[in-house]
Swiss-Prot record:
Protein's cellular compartments: Cytoplasm
NCBIfam families: ilvE_II, PRK13357.1
Stated name of the protein: Branched-chain-amino-acid aminotransferase 6
Entry EC no(s): 2.6.1.42
Lineage: Eukaryota, Viridiplantae, Streptophyta, Embryophyta, Tracheophyta
Gene: BCAT6
GO biological process: glucosinolate biosynthetic process from homomethionine; isoleucine biosynthetic process; L-leucine biosynthetic process; L-methionine salvage; L-valine biosynthetic process
Pfam assignment, any one: Aminotran_4
Principal localisation: cytoplasm
Length: 356
């Protein structure tokens, strides 16, 4: 899938290495970039070659299943600029596979793994001046799969749109020490047999009420419990969770109600590499409150320590800082992503910034 020629030529011919952005002030907010990727296909067919087009609004039928019934998926991944000016993407194949799993659950037509990865590379290459300088942030990449064709009843869309846009970002959480979490015993994020295990667009707006209530009370984020028993922890609004006690690192299993995070998978492997016993199992609230350390993982948040957890009227403080495992794992992961150490895992996909 070759990129359309004129937009990429426009980008490569500019004399600017970087966009006009105050990189030191980046937060996790949208900064519109130059180009996006768009491809379409009919139900039962395959995606044809997509195009790099100017970033902007899209036209969509008011009868589309994405608008009426929430038939849509999204992914999130990042591109990094190294000190030797390489641009790298972290494990895009894993996002492609997760989108395919979600598409099967929502009866959608996904791009192939190769189409997905190539489209991500094209999008990054077209917007390479928006990849922040080393240590100043990352380019957050958001692939979307939308049921965009018109249909009135509840049914698979007759047409699908695969779209990728991006934005330079800084830290997701600005707190320097650790997160202060509220365990929500009122609302639930997912239930058995639902869509909690795929990155459906419908999973996220229902958590906003809980998140706003928590933030208004001074918390950083919300930790949800399982809907079946209300006794086991599941995940935050947009990231996975781990607890540490002794040499054992535990995280809830991805058995249908928890998103199988790419960062979660990577951190589990790194923790195992340095001698920790990693367990995927049900983790009760009682175990959470007795843990020595708690941290969360995700594309946006990377690896972030949890400083406190509040459940009802009980507040527990955890180990953070240089002595914390999360600090070591964060360093191990970001050193791979930024090219500080050799990528022996084969996780990174390099893009030549001189192409285009």
């Amino acid at each position: 899938m070759a990129p359309s020629s004129s937009p990429l030529r426009t980008t490569s011919e500019t004399d600017e290495k970087y966009a006009n952005v105050k990189w030191e002030e980046l937060g996790f907010a949208l900064t519109p970039i130059d180009y996006m990727y768009v491809a379409k296909c009919r139900q039962g067919e395959s995606f044809t070659q997509g195009k790099i087009v100017p970033y902007g609004d899209i036209s969509i039928s008011p009868c589309s299943p994405i608008l009426n019934y929430g038939q849509g998926l999204f992914e999130g991944l990042k591109a990094y600029r190294t000190e030797d000016d390489r641009i790298r993407i972290f494990r895009p194949d894993q996002n492609a596979l997760r989108m395919q799993t979600g598409a099967e659950r929502l009866c959608m037509t996904p791009p192939t793994l190769e189409q997905f990865v190539e489209a991500v590379k094209q999008t990054v290459l077209a917007n390479k001046k928006w990849v922040p300088p080393p240590g100043k942030g990352t380019l957050y990449i958001r692939p979307l799969l939308l049921g965009s064709g018109a249909t009135l009843g509840v049914a698979p869309a007759p047409e699908y749109t695969f779209l990728i846009y991006a934005s330079p970002v800084g830290d997701y959480h600005k707190v320097s020490s650790g997160l202060n979490l509220k365990v929500d015993h009122k609302y639930h994020r997912a239930h058995s047999g639902g869509t909690g295990g795929v990155k459906s667009c419908t999973n996220y707006s229902p958590v906003v009420k809980s998140l706003l209530e928590a933030k208004s009370a001074g918390f950083s984020d919300v930790l949800f419990l399982d809907a079946a028993t209300g006794r086991n922890i599941e995940e935050l609004t947009a990231c996975n969770i781990f607890i540490v006690k002794g040499n054992i690192v535990s995280t809830p299993p991805t058995s249908g109600t928890i998103l199988p995070g790419v960062t979660r998978k990577s951190i589990s492997e790194l923790a195992h590499d340095i001698g920790y016993q990693v367990e995927e199992r049900d983790v009760s609230v009682d175990e959470l409150l007795e843990a020595e350390e708690v941290f969360c993982t995700g594309t946006a948040v990377v690896v972030k320590a949890v400083e406190t957890v509040t459940f009802h009227d009980k507040k527990v403080k955890y180990r953070t800082g240089e002595a914390a495992l999360s600090t070591k794992l964060h360093s191990m992961l970001t050193n791979i992503q930024m090219g500080v150490v050799e990528d022996k895992k084969g996780w990174m996909v390099d893009i030549d910034p001189c192409q285009g």
